[in-house]
Amino acid sequence: MNVLLGGFVIFATFVTLCNASCSFIPNERFPGDSTRECTDLKGNKHPINSKWKTDNCERCTCYKTEIICCTLIATPVGYDKKKCQRIFKKEDCKYIVVEKKNPKKTCPIDQWIL
């Protein structure tokens, strides 16, 4: 059991370091444990099969064996970087791209990454 958990932690770390759009958090279980909830990284409890949005713009789901959190943020990369700048709107979990000289005017975007 410890070997499996250790392997999973290494895998989760690898996925996170690779700038993945999702991260995996093992749900700690002990023999005889019948807990029907997950504990997130802030210590909050969530029922199995529940979903929630985090403060850092991730959508998380609690499963029996793990919590999976995936980013909700699409990052614009295909725009005129000399003429425009991207601005992150945390309240909406999204970027907007506006002209540097006239921030009221948006710029066209042709590529996004998750």
From Swiss-Prot:
Similarity comment: Belongs to the beta-microseminoprotein family.
Disulphide-bridged cysteine pairs: C22-C70, C38-C62, C57-C93, C60-C69, C84-C107
Subunit description: Homodimer; Interacts with PI16.
Gene Ontology CC terms: extracellular region
Gene it is expressed from: MSMB
Superkingdom of origin organism: Eukaryota
Pfam family, one: PSP94
Subcellular location: Secreted
Gene3D superfamilies, per database record: 2.20.25.590, Complement Module, domain 1
Organism this protein belongs to: Macaca mulatta (Rhesus macaque)
Classification lineage: Eukaryota, Metazoa, Chordata, Craniata, Vertebrata
Annotated protein name in UniProt: Beta-microseminoprotein
Major place of residence: secreted
Keyword entries, A-Z: Disulfide bond, Secreted, Signal
Region forming the signal peptide: 1-20
